[in-house]
Swiss-Prot record:
It comes from Thermus thermophilus (strain ATCC BAA-163 / DSM 7039 / HB27). It comes from the Bacteria. GO terms for biological process: proton motive force-driven plasma membrane ATP synthesis. InterPro entries: ATPase_V1-cplx_f_g_su, ATPase_V1-cplx_fsu_bac/arc, ATPase_V1_fsu_sf. The gene is atpF. This is V-type ATP synthase subunit F. GO terms for molecular function: ATP binding; proton-transporting ATP synthase activity, rotational mechanism; proton-transporting ATPase activity, rotational mechanism. Belongs to the V-ATPase F subunit family. The keyword Transport applies. The lineage of its organism: Bacteria, Thermotogati, Deinococcota, Deinococci, Thermales. It holds the Pfam family ATP-synt_F.
């Protein structure tokens, strides 16, 4: 699993044991997202919606003809994780999205 968020939030994900990639602009986030999808190796890539200019269009365009990774735009990543259990939150979000629980 990979997470694209602002640099500070990405660092928090790395500290929690996930692969966090920091982006400071929509262009940087889009480039990272394209790179991660093309490179492969991830079943799930979560990205902070605030970093995408048009989240639905970005996901639709990148995933055309692909099954993996699952792209999961998430609103307010930074605010959601201040003082909370990052791993537990992501596990619950993944469970709701794909229908079963996984150990991150």
């Amino acid at each position: 699993m990979a997470v694209i968020a602002d640099p500070e939030t990405a660092q928090g994900f790395r500290l929690a044991g996930l692969e966090g990639y920091g982006a400071s602009s929509a262009e940087e986030a889009q480039s990272l997202l394209e790179t991660l999808v093309e490179r492969g190796g991830y079943a799930l890539v979560a990205v902070d919606e605030a970093l995408l200019s048009d989240p639905e269009r970005a996901v639709e365009r990148l995933m055309r003809g692909r099954d993996l990774p699952v792209l999961l735009p998430i609103a307010g990543l930074k605010e959601a994780f201040q003082g909370h259990d990052v791993e537990g939150y992501m596990r619950e979000l993944v469970r709701k999205t794909i229908g079963f629980d996984i150990k991150l």
